[in-house]
Amino acid sequence: MALLTPFLPCFMVAMKRSRNIVILTGAGISAESGIDTFRSAGGLWEQHRVEDVATPEAFARDPDLVLRFYDMRREAIQTKEPNPAHLALARLDREWPKRDGGQVLIVTQNVDDLHERGGALNVLHMHGEHLNAWCLACDSRPRWTGTLIDRPPCPVCSEPALRPDIVWFGEVPYRMDEIYEAVAAADLFVSIGTSGAVYPAAGLVRTARELGLQTLELNLERSQGSAWFDETRLGPASEIVPAWVDELLG
């Protein structure tokens, strides 16, 4: 188990006295489970430019390419397993409310289900989920583990109008009002495995600081928003996240 550089005593006390915690997770937490990040691939996803597979315009221009791409990603994600960072956050999610009735909310930018499979219950997907589809005819979002390339009928309305339930570039992330309300009610904001480059998620730490929350960054390397955090600890998520959870619950 990795040992974290000791926190300032006043910050450690403030963390332990927190009641509600909001944790933002990004691609870095799932990378160690074998899910490639867009930025680590030199601006390519499976050799595709983001403009070709992750925008509404791309879907309108070449829906077959987009559907094949997401079918491949959906299949691949189902072969991956949660790593120690996911398991540690699930433990925190279970045990923290027992202390003072507080709550942990995991707000993830990731579209995999590794937090849930790791045992976390309070997870909010702001960028959608690979294992959901979105029907453009009836606006339902059914669970979906198969393929979409053959235009299967929606299980709700029977129309062949399903697309990936993913927030593409240029679209509005999901449940932002809930996220801001949770940050406003929290005492501690933690960012794990994020680049600090994708908004509005990247702006949450600034909101947290302006509201007076304690802020902590756990990342492989410093992010574009590191200056906004009270404390930063660097290292692989699978090592530093369990170490932090051990300290917080200890």
Report residues per predicted region.
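Conserved catalytic core of sirtuin-type NAD+-dependent deacylases
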Residues: 2-250
